[in-house]
Amino acid sequence: MSEKNAYAKSGVDVEAGYEVVERIKKHVARTERAGVMGALGGFGGMFDLSKTGVKEPVLVSGTDGVGTKLMLAIKYDKHDTIGQDCVAMCVNDIIAAGAEPLYFLDYIATGKNNPVKLEEVVSGVAEGCVQAGAALIGGETAEMPGMYGQDDYDLAGFAVGVAEKSQIIDGSKVKEGDILLGLASSGIHSNGYSLVRRVFADYTGKELLPELEGKQLKDVLLEPTRIYVKAALPLIKEELVKGIGHITGGGFIENIPRMFADDLAAEIDEDKVPVLPIFKALEKYGDIKHEEMFEIFNMGVGLMLAVSPENVNRVKELLDEPVYEIGRIIKKADASVVIK
């Protein structure tokens, strides 16, 4: 028995792995940017930091996955957007520190290599990288029979960006009286899906719920996470933003306080929050308490900005989209987030 046959009998298809690499090359090529060194397939991805033109560079990194949203991608057999979710979860975190994404690496683990399916996943990763301006410089596809079912896979990523040292955003400049501006989310994004799956466990995904304005449920649930890089970078370059919050797991309550010092709080005008239809549906069909929704979901705001009052108009001018003035920074009395 040859070594190749022995490995195949253990459930690992080396040839399928080679096919995956060949299939994804054209998607990786879409993401190339200045600074990338070497070619796909080396032992390590390389990037020339001097090509960024940043005078005092500070590297900012972030890593994340997609959580159980993957289970819906598998259930509905739709794999071409889940990669964008993975990129978004990483690059939105580093943009919150004032960093421009430079490059990205992905990790896919599966029970059985399916080259067509994995190409779809990586095509979504590449699309996310294009939207973020980040190069996909490497990754790993691990076939692990026995660890995962044949149709199952997991996806995670790692992003590195660069910030000018003087432009790092850490919330230390946020002060009482600053205005909180919200940028719309595209949907649920990539958090809260254990609850989402429970609420809609008995649904096929083809339902046209009245709250969803003619869209099939599965399309709304798998709407890819918005990437905020191109919206936020011009604001960072002009130093118009004092704090940025990526509204992920924990919703408003957990994420907004990460934007400012412990002696401050956020006062939110709930009437100004652009709540998306899917959140109204989740609250209704899941019988979820209204206040708990703000502890779990983004509620229609995926990125929060803390801005000086005198800079609000300039920020709105630079952003070619609706901007929601949903709150302000106050002195902390008790709670870190007060929703009125």
Swiss-Prot record:
Keywords attached to this entry: ATP-binding, Cytoplasm, Ligase, Nucleotide-binding, Purine biosynthesis
GO terms classed as biological process: 'de novo' IMP biosynthetic process; adenine biosynthetic process
Enzyme class: ligase
Alphabetized Pfam families for the sequence: AIRS (PF00586), AIRS_C (PF02769)
Pathway(s) per entry: Purine metabolism; IMP biosynthesis via de novo pathway; 5-amino-1-(5-phospho-D-ribosyl)imidazole from N(2)-formyl-N(1)-(5-phospho-D-ribosyl)glycinamide: step 2/2
Alphabetical list of InterPro entries matching this protein: PurM-like_C_dom, PurM-like_C_sf, PurM-like_N, PurM-like_N_sf, PurM_cligase
Family named by the database record: Belongs to the AIR synthase family.
Protein name as it appears in the record: Phosphoribosylformylglycinamidine cyclo-ligase
Organism from which the protein derives: Streptococcus pyogenes serotype M1
